[in-house]
C-alpha cells in the first residue's frame, strides 16, 4: 500500500461503486471474497479505493 496515493472510501461509496448492499458486502468480506476494510476509528471503517477498483475489474 502506497500511502501517498492511497484513497480511503467509506461504505456508502463502496456500495455505489459495486451496486451491492451493505449486508451483501459484509457477507463477501466474511467469506474472504471481498477486500477487507481498515479501521479508521472505534466504530468506523474504510476501504482502499484501488483494492475495490481491482476487485470490480476482476469480478
Language model features with spans:
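Polyanion-binding surface elements
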Residues: 2-24, 51-58
Amino acid at each position: 500500500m502506497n500511502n501517498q496515493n492511497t484513497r480511503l472510501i467509506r461504505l456508502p461509496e463502496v456500495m455505489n461503486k459495486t451496486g451491492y448492499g451493505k449486508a451483501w458486502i459484509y457477507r463477501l468480506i466474511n467469506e474472504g471474497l471481498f477486500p477487507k476494510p481498515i479501521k479508521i476509528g472505534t466504530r468506523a471503517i474504510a476501504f482502499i479505493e484501488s483494492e475495490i477498483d481491482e476487485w470490480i475489474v476482476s469480478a
